[in-house]
């Protein structure tokens, strides 16, 4: 407030000098960036994601609109039930190499490769369902529409304006793709 910190406290292993992964807070930043890009005409909210990322054309995301990604109203088979070892979230994070891959793993090796394996379940636009893959796909759309990486978009549109004392960091996969679904630190 008025240039001064009003309240600051650290719990557990967190310290003023330490890094803290923001996980799903990342989604809010990219929802905001997506809305900014719709407002300035860079993105068409009613266009299919595949307009910006042709690789998504034959995937479950192919006919999902930018608005449906922003609103998380895609009809996708993707569970984030963390108590279920077979939930799709685990394969998603394995693809990005956030978790060790089991011996013989032959699945997707990047976040974007994983998006191409997601199956459709129901219709897009019918109901909200919290699914990290929506924001990961949105990040890909944003990167393509702006010709800038996910990280550069965050830096330019939000981080540089926050007055943050330090740079932000991103979790990346094996090819250097930032995890828009939850990789901000």
Regions found by a protein language model. Name each.
Residues 10-14, 51, 136-137:
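Acidic/histidine-rich, surface-exposed loop or edge segments in extracytoplasmic proteins
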Residues 122-130, 178-185:
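Solvent-exposed loop and edge beta-strand segments that line ligand/cofactor-binding
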Residues 21, 39-82, 117, 133, ...:
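Active-site helix/loop module of the DD-peptidase/beta-lactamase fold
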Residues 3, 21-46, 69, 138-142:
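Active-site SXXK
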Residues 108-109, 129-136:
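A short mid-domain helix/strand-loop element embedded in enzyme catalytic domains
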Residues 1-22:
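Short, conserved catalytic-motif segment at the N-terminal edge
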Residues 4-9, 48-51, 85-123, 149-167:
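Short, charged, amphipathic alpha-helices and their helix-cap/turn boundaries
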């Amino acid at each position: 407030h008025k240039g001064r910190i009003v309240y600051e406290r650290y719990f557990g292993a967190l310290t003023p000098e330490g890094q803290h992964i923001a996980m799903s807070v990342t989604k809010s930043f990219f929802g905001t960036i997506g809305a900014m890009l719709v407002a300035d005409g860079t993105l068409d909210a009613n266009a299919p994601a595949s307009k910006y990322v042709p690789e998504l054309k034959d995937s479950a995301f192919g006919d999902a609109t930018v608005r449906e990604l922003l609103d998380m109203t895609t009809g996708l088979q993707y569970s984030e039930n963390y108590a279920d070892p077979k939930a799709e979230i685990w394969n998603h994070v394995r693809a990005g190499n956030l978790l060790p891959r089991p011996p013989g793993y032959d699945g997707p090796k990047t976040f974007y490769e994983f998006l191409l394996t997601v199956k459709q379940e129901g219709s897009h636009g019918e109901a909200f369902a919290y699914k990290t893959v929506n924001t990961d796909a949105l990040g890909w759309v944003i990167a393509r529409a702006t010709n800038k990486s996910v990280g550069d978009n965050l830096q330019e549109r939000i981080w540089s304006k926050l007055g943050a004392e330090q740079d932000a960091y991103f979790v990346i996969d094996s090819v250097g793709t930032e995890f828009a679904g939850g990789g901000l630190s």
